Amino acid sequence: MLLFLVFILVVSQVVLLLLSPQFRDKFIFRWYYDEVYKPMILDNSRYRIKFYVVPVFYLSVYSYMVYIFYSRTFAIISPMLTSIETYVVIPLMLILPLFFGSMSMIIKPDSSNAHQIGSEKRYPYDNLLYFPQHECRTCKQVKPARSKHCTVCNSCIYLADHHCVWINNCVGMGNYMYFYSFLCSNLLLLSYSFIRLIFIQFNKSAYNTTPTGEKSLLILSILCGSFTVILAVYCYFVFELVNSGMTTNEKDKWQMVHDYINTGDLVRDPEGKYFIKYQNGGNNYEFYSTDSYDGTQYTIVDYFTVKSPAEITNIYDKGNFINNLREFIG
């Protein structure tokens, strides 16, 4: 009964939190929006303990699954495990996600607040996604190529990918290796556990168990299988970006460029500079730089319409997955 009441309380708070922006003109929602939603969600400077909710959730689920394994299933399946699995493989695979997860949280990426000498000049400006001599509107420092300001970390992150809520840290120059290792170690543990548990359950004659033990095996198998699929899909998208030589932040920028190409609005002048073409009645066009900081209207007479992404070179792509991976973790 107590758990049910707690569940109802949590669900009601989540519903109020999600609906308060849309119905903030209503009394109860207005109060919730002003006193809870704004300080908890919109204001990153207040209640910063909120950023640890997701890491604690991950650790709770992880601990629960380990508890089920050792308290309810290990004794059942141990006769079918080899000594290497029992004393080396399983303990090691249980430790690695915690180790790499901790390192991903602790190791901060290079940023405008703290970075190695020269790291801010590591990448050239491509004059399509990134432009020189731009000052970050928030931290008031020159923005290096491939950087992005993070409102949670309150700094410009070099080689910025994204702010990961699972580790409460930005993924960027200096901690890609730990983040990728965190993903892979979790995927390895989950997939191994799922496959091993399924194999064991198909050989029920080799062990004796109670209905409770059978239920625990089933719960653990479902959890491992579900998380394996989710994490495998996510890892695929992460490493597909690596293969393309781009970050998550750059993927969104490239998507915008591709949208302009599809509509025939991205053009290039004889000097190789890119502009966005806007129709201004009839055959009249206005031209603006792809630089969001530059609001100047340009007059261009001679230009070439970019018709395919293949006509644009991603100067940050090193040609293959291995070289790009070295670039990220190097």
From Swiss-Prot:
It is found in: Endoplasmic reticulum membrane. It is a multi-pass membrane protein. It comes from the Eukaryota. Its main location: endoplasmic reticulum. One of its GO terms (biological process) is vacuole fusion, non-autophagic. The keyword Iron does not apply. Residues 134-184 form the DHHC domain. GO terms for cellular component: actin cortical patch; actin filament bundle; endoplasmic reticulum membrane; Golgi apparatus. Keywords: Acyltransferase, Endoplasmic reticulum, Lipoprotein, Membrane, Palmitate, Transferase, Transmembrane, Transmembrane helix. Residues 22-50, 108-181, 240-330 are cytoplasmic. Its EC number is 2.3.1.225. It catalyses: L-cysteinyl-[protein] + hexadecanoyl-CoA = S-hexadecanoyl-L-cysteinyl-[protein] + CoA. The chain crosses the membrane at residues 1-21, 51-71, 87-107, 182-202, 219-239. Palmitoyltransferase that targets several endosomal SNAREs. Palmitoylates the SNAREs at cysteine residues close to the cytoplasmic end of their transmembrane domain. May have a role in the cellular quality control of transmembrane domain-containing proteins. The DHHC domain is required for palmitoyltransferase activity. Belongs to the DHHC palmitoyltransferase family. SWF1 subfamily. This is Palmitoyltransferase SWF1.
